[in-house]
């Protein structure tokens, strides 16, 4: 079981590396890693388990965050009342198209690898299309908008050595861009 001690923190060199593409089929170890990443998210969202093991709640985890520089992400976004939830383990995800319109979370973003709160708006694409493989090597295509699009972009950034705060405007950190949508 992954815990917070398995998650590397800001400043670790792996977080700034471009992660390696995975060859398919995945090895047994790679599959086990991806399943453990998803399990961490499930556990982190369970109040009792999270408290018992000191887990910070998360909706996404990228392999580089557990010091594995490979292009794998897990995303688990619970239903917010809209009837939609997102539960994906993706291999070699790529954003193949995106909107011009930007979106941002008014509270900014957080990250399991960043212990401090970093003030500032993180502008991302409001709509994206992702192509990836699932754990068995099947093709996946996702069209996402709003909060799910933001979460997937955050995780894919980790695969490219980018941290969320890299997107914050240093001169005007709390200023929304013109025409950007608050999510």
From Swiss-Prot:
Gene3D superfamilies: Peptide deformylase (3.90.45.10). Coiled coil: none annotated. The active site is at 155. It catalyses: N-terminal N-formyl-L-methionyl-[peptide] + H2O = N-terminal L-methionyl-[peptide] + formate. SUPFAM superfamilies: Peptide deformylase (SSF56420). The keyword Hydrolase applies. Keywords: Hydrolase, Iron, Metal-binding, Protein biosynthesis. Its EC number is 3.5.1.88. The keyword Kinase does not apply. Its cofactor is Fe(2+). It comes from the Bacteria. One of its GO terms (molecular function) is metal ion binding. It is an enzyme of class 3 (hydrolase). Fe cation binds at residues 111, 154, 158. One of its GO terms (biological process) is translation. Removes the formyl group from the N-terminal Met of newly synthesized proteins. Requires at least a dipeptide for an efficient rate of reaction. N-terminal L-methionine is a prerequisite for activity but the enzyme has broad specificity at other positions. PANTHER family: PEPTIDE DEFORMYLASE (PTHR10458), PEPTIDE DEFORMYLASE 2 (PTHR10458:SF8). NCBIfam families: pept_deformyl (TIGR00079). Belongs to the polypeptide deformylase family. This is Peptide deformylase.
């Amino acid at each position: 079981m992954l815990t917070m001690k398995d998650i590397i923190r800001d400043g670790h060199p792996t977080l700034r590396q471009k992660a390696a593409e995975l060859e398919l089929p995945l090895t047994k170890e790679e599959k086990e890693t991806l399943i453990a990443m998803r399990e961490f998210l499930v556990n982190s969202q369970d109040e009792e388990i999270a408290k018992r093991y000191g887990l910070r709640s998360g909706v996404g985890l990228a392999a580089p965050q557990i010091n594995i520089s490979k292009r794998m992400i897990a995303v688990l976004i619970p239903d917010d009342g809209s009837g939609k939830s997102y539960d994906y383990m993706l291999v070699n995800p790529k954003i193949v198209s995106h909107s011009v319109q930007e979106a941002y979370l008014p509270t900014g973003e957080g990250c399991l690898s960043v212990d401090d709160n970093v003030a500032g708006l993180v502008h991302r694409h409001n709509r994206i299309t992702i192509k990836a493989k699932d754990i068995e090597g099947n093709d996946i295509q996702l069209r996402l908008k709003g909060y799910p699009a933001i979460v997937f972009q955050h995780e894919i950034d980790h695969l490219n050595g980018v941290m969320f705060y890299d997107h914050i405007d240093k001169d005007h950190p709390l200023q929304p861009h013109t025409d950007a949508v608050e999510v």
